[in-house]
Design a protein with these regions (language model features):
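Phosphate- and other anionic-substrate recognition elements at nucleic-acid/protein interfaces
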Residues: 1-110
Length: 110
C-alpha cells in the first residue's frame, strides 16, 4: 500500500492507496486551532499518533510526500512562512522514516 502526504502547517492531507490504486482512506488533519496546537511539535505529535495507527492497520510499503512549496507568491508567502513549512515538512518526513523504516519519495508540486 502507498501512503501519500500533502504536508502543511495548517491542514495536512493524506491518502492510503491499495496495490490496485484504489483509495482506502483519504482525509486531512486540521491543525488550525491555535489553542490546541500551540507549537509546531504539537502538530507533529498529532500526526505521529495517526501514522503509528496506520502502521498497525495497513501494510504500507511506499510513502510519497509532496515536495514543499518552494517559491514566493506575491502577498501569499513570506520568508517566515516558507521556513516554517520547510521545517514542518522535514519533521513529518523524519517521523515517517522513523515509523515506517523506509526511504520516502518526494515529488514536485503542481
Amino acid at each position: 500500500m502507498l501512503l501519500g502526504l500533502d504536508i502543511s502547517t495548517s491542514i495536512t492531507g493524506f491518502t492510503i492507496l491499495d496495490h490496485q490504486g484504489e483509495i482506502i482512506r483519504c482525509d486531512a488533519w486540521d491543525m488550525r486551532n491555535k489553542n490546541k496546537f500551540k507549537k509546531i511539535f504539537d502538530k507533529a505529535s498529532f500526526i505521529k499518533d495517526d501514522l503509528l495507527f496506520f502502521k498497525a492497520q495497513y501494510p504500507i510499503n511506499s510513502i510519497y510526500i509532496e515536495q514543499p512549496f518552494m517559491f514566493f507568491n506575491s502577498g501569499g508567502s513570506s520568508a517566515k512562512t516558507m521556513a516554517s513549512l520547510q521545517r514542518f515538512n522535514g519533521i513529518i518526513s523524519w517521523i515517517c522514516y522513523d515509523i515506517f523504516g523506509m526511504d520516502l519519495f518526494t515529488g514536485a508540486p503542481n
